[in-house]
Amino acid sequence: MSTKDFIEKDYYKVLGVPKDATEAEIKKAYRKLAREFHPDANKGNAKAEERFKEISEANDILGDTKKRKEYDEARTLFGNGGFRPGPGAQGGSFNFDLGDLFGGGAQQGGGAGGGFGGGIGDVFGGLFNRGGAGPGTGTRTQPRRGQDIESEVTLSFTEAVDGATVPLRMSSQAPCKACSGTGDANGTPRVCPTCVGTGQVARGSGGGFSLTDPCPDCKGRGLIAENPCEICKGSGRAKSSRTMQVRIPAGVSDSQRIRLRGKGAPGERGGPAGDLYVVVHVDAHPVFGRKGDNLTVTVPVTFAEAALGGEVKVPTLGGPAVTLKLPPGTPNGRTMRARGKGAVRKDGTRGDLLVTVEVTVPKDVSGKARDALEAYREATAGEDPRAELFQAAKGA
């Protein structure tokens, strides 16, 4: 990406969020758009794939507090076509320390080229040159970090609670195997004469500064392939697919995003690999539910068990049943707790199993059961469970 594109691209607009959006709002917007335009959900749709890349790029900047700050400050300074010196500024003089802004000191070399180190340099790729220096100044193209990759995986309810190792197939740009990443079929590219191997050319912007863009002749690589590789068309990068075993930790929740450092696309020119982000989807369970670190289950009990009390066996997820004691007069909907039978927490301990009692009413009653219920009704004929209800209704 050119520095001009970086400054002029409105990442807030890409994600559809305001400039004062919170981290949570940015994350929510990104997840919604990423799911909508993910390549797996839009196979063969080139526009959706390009949109997904744009969304991921915006999230990479706005989702990182430091990068977002640098991006906002750079847009403020250069969003209107470049920095304009204040009254009294002459030539290449500059009375504002950009090094303070970008996390590195400004290097001055009498207008013969230079730059800013650290901080935003990783994002801008050497944004500034002093004094409008021409092509060939600066350092040779630096190693470039590989792209981040996002993938999705669907787990069963039990796998999400206990953790699982799953195969994950990913596609990304990697050094072309046919030409060993050189872009040249013979493996011997030559140094680009336009940028003298830097991969960048300078253009004036006024105020004694010049901005750098990727060299149009070598596409920012610093090298030109005399004999372009047929596989990568001289770019040195080709699409590569690989399958790796990914360990999903215990206790993950639905829609959780897991970051695996260094497992993304390989870097360029010896640069580090990007990161892999795995979005986890969890299937529903026919019996158990989940509330945070706790699991939930509804257990039916008879009228007699609820009224008289007793012991009830309760199933657990992947383990032996536990026995809970019902106190006499247990109402329908009461929730009890089986400690340590829930989901795994980050510290390795487990949450609880929340057991909700559901008093069942038989549809067909006959024989001794009917006689017993008739006797119970006669014995409690003087009791009115709705008396307090009507009393409260009158007093309201």
Curated annotation (Swiss-Prot):
Binds 2 Zn(2+) ions per monomer. A zinc finger (CR-type) spans 163-241. Its main location: cytoplasm. Zn(2+) 2 binds at residues 192, 195, 215, 218. SUPFAM superfamilies: Chaperone J-domain (SSF46565), DnaJ/Hsp40 cysteine-rich domain (SSF57938), HSP40/DnaJ peptide-binding domain (SSF49493). Transmembrane segments: none annotated. This is Chaperone protein DnaJ 1. It comes from Streptomyces avermitilis (strain ATCC 31267 / DSM 46492 / JCM 5070 / NBRC 14893 / NCIMB 12804 / NRRL 8165 / MA-4680).
